[in-house]
Regions:
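Conserved acetyl-CoA pyrophosphate-binding loop and the N-cap/start of the following alpha-helix
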Residues: 101, 105-113
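Conserved N-terminal entry element of GNAT/NAT acetyltransferase domains
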Residues: 1-11, 22
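Conserved beta-strand in the GNAT
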Residues: 60, 66-75, 91, 96
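Conserved acetyl-CoA binding element of GNAT-fold acetyltransferases
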Residues: 83-99
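Conserved GNAT acetyl-CoA-binding A-motif
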Residues: 111, 118-131
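Conserved GNAT-fold acetyl-CoA-binding loop/helix
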Residues: 24-46
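A short helix-loop-beta-strand connector motif used in the catalytic cores of GNAT acetyltransferases and
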Residues: 45-60
């Protein structure tokens, strides 16, 4: 196994969008017959805007040339609170590893990179929802 972790850029829109649909199908137990065209289109536009304005960071993981995993974090603002005076928050999402690559620390390393990105932006309020898959 020869893993590389790449911060996604605008050139990765197609792969990010394709992976987002895979994650949603898996997390929601949707068949390939379920129409996801609208979600796919909106996901593409989301990544297009968010990658450029810095409100989303994603990592792509490859074993040599083969895509094997991903993870992302979106940044947003809420009203300031006592415990979060800046109001900045991060939401980790779209964590995915190909089944045959699971239990090898790929998601853990990706998660660590995403948390570090949030901390580097001064964000301390970070959340993540997990599915039954992990």
């Amino acid at each position: 196994m020869e893993l590389t972790y790449k911060k996604a850029t605008i050139e990765d829109l197609d792969l990010l969008t394709e992976t987002r649909i895979k994650v949603l199908r898996a997390a929601n137990q949707l068949s390939d017959k379920e129409d996801m065209k609208e979600v796919e289109k909106e996901s593409y536009h989301y990544y297009q805007k968010a990658l450029l304005d810095g409100s989303h960071i994603a990592y792509l993981v490859f074993d040599r040339e083969r895509f094997v995993g991903t993870g992302g974090v979106c940044f947003f603002q809420v009203m300031p609170t006592y415990h979060n005076p800046c109001g900045k928050k991060a939401y980790i999402m779209n964590m995915y590893t190909l089944p045959e690559y699971r239990r090898r620390g790929i998601a853990a390393k990706t998660l660590d990179m995403l948390v570090k990105d949030a901390w580097n932006k001064g964000i301390r309020a970070i959340s993540l929802e997990a599915t039954d898959m992990g």
